[in-house]
């Protein structure tokens, strides 16, 4: 009797497996679509990702102007797929993504902006540059900078900058000590607070670092700042981990701002 039961269960299990396989094959594939049709990528120094979350995952890419961006399909070890965009020169072009199985197409506009870097303030007793403020320094001829606040309800930056200004890095010689400075120019009222209709004022901040080599390298790389006097002894070796903390102090005051550089993206439609 037992000899008859065992083959019976084997046949049943094979039948169920075959049915499940047929069900998976007959399950309709979700159409291919994207959440956004507009993307920005900074010039050369970073990659913007377009996540592929539906469709077959078998995607073909066609860039209208390959002198502006480079686009590549990337598949992670976990199986997730995305398109990596890298900016080659400033400008705007389109990228068409085609699902080779479903035939669905999506065309997105891609804008390459000036390179920039973010400085996020973690702690501060400064009246204007307060904690949770994000400062973006742009690598353009004007040396523009933008100040953004956080939308705590949505846990993201507000889309419109709180203020705009310009920046400059320079060095002061204090006896035998060389001190780097960041000069920020922005409109401020008599108390030093941001004010749109007020005249531009210059604010100088002395800089200190937890890891001077790492910070000076990232500033030089993203903003083309020449720190010859400060990095003359820097090596080209990788020294992990790297700490991008930078401390700003206002000379002859007790104001101290502690933050760190990051490659966080600026809200869209801000930069040219």
What are these regions (language model features)?
Residues 20-271:
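Extracytoplasmic soluble-region selector
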Residues 15-18:
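C-terminal motif of bacterial Sec signal peptides marking the signal peptidase cleavage site
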Residues 2-10:
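Sec-dependent signal peptide recognition
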